[in-house]
Amino acid sequence: MNYSAVKYILSYVLMIEGALLLFPFIVGVLYMEQKSVWYLLVAVICIVLGVLGTRHKPKNTMFYFKEGCLATAASWITLSIFGSLPLILTGEYPSYVDALFEIVSGFTTTGATVLSDVECLCHATLFWRAFTHWIGGMGVLVFLLMIIPMSGGSNMNLMRAESPGPSVGKLVPHLKSTAQILYVIYFGMTVVQVILLLLGGMSLF
């Protein structure tokens, strides 16, 4: 088992989550919500831990299927643990278990919630809840395939572990390019749906 390569992947996952946590912080700033500072704090922690973990690239970055499975499971656990921290730090969820359930529900696109009225949350938290569903729709590890330099076999094993079904199809010969195409389509569909909702009279938020 290549644990150093798995640790390297997890460090990148933390950096990405730190960057993503800046979005709800910005939303909170726009709505002048003091609670949004917790999103910035957790974002900084994630980025610092991620940078420390990627300072030394492992000599062997080869990924086999078992490493892919471990990296996938550990990545989703890491995302959920750190992603739920702002929810409990803002004081909007009664317990960490509830906050963790909420974020796991988001990243897995389950849609379940422990709250009877989500509208009582601040704008930053409302955005983060919705954003986790959007992130989970494609998968963070698919995004990693576009930015982490790995061998083709390692990319495929990581993709196999992340994707449902017994096999993974590629739109183009290079898996990195496939991930890029998938995200372009995903972004495009998101923009189209936002425009349609705006035309239907819904506010941007």
Predicted regions and their residues:
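Membrane-proximal intracellular helices of multi-pass ion channels
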Residues: M1-F205
